[in-house]
Amino acid sequence: MLSNQEIEELITFFERTGLTDYFQNMSCQNIQDYVTGVEVGLDTHARKNRSGEAMELVVGPIIQEIVKRRNLPYQIENQKYFRYLVDHYDLEISTSLLNRKADFILVGDKNKIVNIEVNFFSGTGSKPQEIVDSYINRQNELLENGFYFIWITDGFGWKGQKNQIRKGLEMIDYPLNLHFARKGLLEKILCQILQDSN
């Protein structure tokens, strides 16, 4: 049996890590099935997608909390194609970006647009290598449109990928992990972008 203090500590842990939101919003109806692996399944692609969705569920509340606490003039859009900005914000966007989907798009004052992409790698392989190159290209396309790019990534899969993570750190303006995002660096970057004169 857990003590009241242990229960409070578990509740705090679930809230701070985003697990509360994750379990409340997950697609399965039974946590026991999820934990025993029935819902998670053996399909690698589905598992990768699920880890990406889990990262969105962890990072989304961090972004919302920053915007609310600092009263930042950002509208937060989740899982939208850039075409959405043309249709709903009357922005001009290059055709190369129109059909690209973003984890998060923040639309700020004076059309300050920030694309935040998140991912988590639990294992090594070709995916971390591919993602670095694709996000370098994404940032370049965004910069051509006057937009900003933030990449939040984490996971043990990066441990054996030092060259790739170094490449990302050198070529991407705002690469973060969850620790830095939670400890104020994401907040600092979002405030800095609003003050940027571009």
Region roles according to the model:
Residues M1-K68:
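Interdomain/boundary linker segments immediately adjacent to catalytic/signaling cores
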Residues G41-R50, L85-I93, F121-S126:
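Surface-exposed cleft-lining segments at the edges of enzyme active sites
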Residues I63, F104-L106, K110-S122, Y135:
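Conserved catalytic cores of phosphodiester-cleaving nucleases, focusing on short active-site segments
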Residues N115, I150-W151:
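Structural beta-sheet core signal
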Residues E117-E130, F156:
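Short beta-strand-loop-alpha-helix junction that forms the active-site gateway
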Residues G125-N145:
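Basic, amphipathic alpha-helical patches used to engage nucleic acids or provide basic targeting signals
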